[in-house]
Amino acid sequence: MKKLFLWLTLLIVFIAVLAYSIVFSKFGNELIASYIENKVNNPQQNIKFKVTNFRLRVDSLDFNAVINENSNISVNGALSIWNRWVDLKYDIKITDLSILNNLINQNLKSELFTNGVFKGDYQSAIIQGFSNIANSETKYNLVLKDFKIKDILLELKNAKIDELLNFMNKPHYLNGDLTINANIRNIDNNNLDGKLIANISKGQLENDVINKEFNQTFSSKINIDGDIEASFLGKNAEIKTQLLTSIGNLILEKTLVDLEKDRVVSDYKFEVKNLQKLESVLGRK
């Protein structure tokens, strides 16, 4: 019985040493890097993903990869396999997001640079970083619970609206700058809690695109500035909207949205100081 116990102990130790040598050794790292490359490249036709550095140890990770020779992903820092926590820094530079559309099941365009930290364990973690999305100055802080986003703190400053539309692969309806400040402490649709403030400045409609997409006949330039304030509580949202345009002003003091029932109730006021400015919109005098 003692010999059997001894042999079982030796077998367990051998398996543990073998697993360590495979996973955390140079040979094992090369196998993992090759697996990652194949996993990304095989389903794609327009991606050449190459892992240039992969070093995984029990307490650290260094990872660098190149996509199509002009985009880079870098992740490095400390981790604990046994305690399941990480303290990692990331730096991502993608020059053309459209190459990832099949991989992420989203239809995106433009470029994306972002860097930050990912810190925490499997129960609670944060992702905090910066981005230049749509030529903006953006800060974000995400709180994760059980690997699901719970809280969002976002500061998006002076994003170019036309570049945001291009980012989402949408027609170029509008030019201008967009600033958003959002503090959502719970994104559960049944128990929302937070606020969002958005500002549009220097906005101008692209008449050619509007006319084509919506079968309109706009001819005069339409400038837009606007402010939106939204409060979220439970399953409801309350929104105040003010849009100031060169043809008139649209003001919605109180819009109530029932997110569960998809129901909207709102007041509105549309002010026009010069009816002649509506001629190009209405198509008649």
Predicted regions and their residues:
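N-terminal type II signal-anchor transmembrane helix
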Residues: 1-41
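Hydrophobic lipid-interacting interfaces of membrane-associated proteins
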Residues: 33-37, 41, 45, 52-82, ...
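A residue-level signal for beta-strand positions that form part of recognition/binding surfaces
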Residues: 151
